[in-house]
């Protein structure tokens, strides 16, 4: 931990002692205590949690130095891979509108890909479930726009289609390009028109938020490459890319992400097929179970901590490198958001994120809502 990060953690203790900042309408002492403890232990610089149960609690600081002020309901986070859910949602909307065939080879929409001339069988849905055979190598990691797309379109799968689940950011880069081509818009404009606008998500963007006073700062240990200004993309590929890409790295607030998750739960704004696609297991093999763009409860998971929660087999969840996690569980009538600035790495912070989701999902006195401790989930 750097001196700057140490000072931040020390300053956060003062906020913890005052009990954090509550913006919600439900008393959840266990949630507040857990958030304060995770900040005090240096796992996170700050956290904002919100849920359909009425939770809305903030803890810690917005920046690495305490003079940046505390986290608030307006704090704007780099979602990292949680942003993949926004790409998936846009694809689902195009599918519901009849403009996207998720069972078609993805090369029908990206004909310049090297596989287009090789009778490609990898479908759009395969990309969304990370089962098409691509690995997470990133040969397109360059700031040269021409080279970026040449390398992206030359990338080949390393496994047979449908053989296994293998998380790969390039899958969602391809999906983002498909959205652009079907809408004739950049991702930010497409999302504002089709998704964020209808949901009232006015504080979400795919663009950088360098001059936004609510932008959250992330520790140097969370990213590669040059030092970022507050509000620049944390992910190195997103930072170097010529424009926003579908692998994530949107910026948003807990309020906006709760609007998105609550709509997934209530199914009110969009066609039924939009929701069904994202809640239906499209890949179930080797202990991994995935819907279109989301992880689902299974024997294994992208992150083991998810399998140790009480979420049902209908639940969907996604996490991001920077420290966030969102979940929607129809059987528990729950939607929850954890946005945070992790400082201790993925392995040490994934369990605590799941614990915070559980603490919000649990109904006091409800059967089957016993929560697991973050340290147990992290095993």
List PLM regions with ranges.
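N-terminal export signals
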Residues: 5-24
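A short acidic/small-residue loop/turn micro-motif
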Residues: 17, 62-66, 342-345
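Short, conserved catalytic-motif segment at the N-terminal edge
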Residues: 25-77, 150
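Short active-site loop at a secondary-structure junction
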Residues: 41-47, 67-126, 159-170, 245-248, ...
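Short, surface-exposed loop or secondary-structure junction motifs
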Residues: 56, 60-61, 116-315
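Short, well-ordered beta-strand elements
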Residues: 57, 323-343
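Short, gly/Ser/Thr-rich active-site loops of penicillin-recognizing serine hydrolases
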Residues: 281, 286, 299-303, 345-379
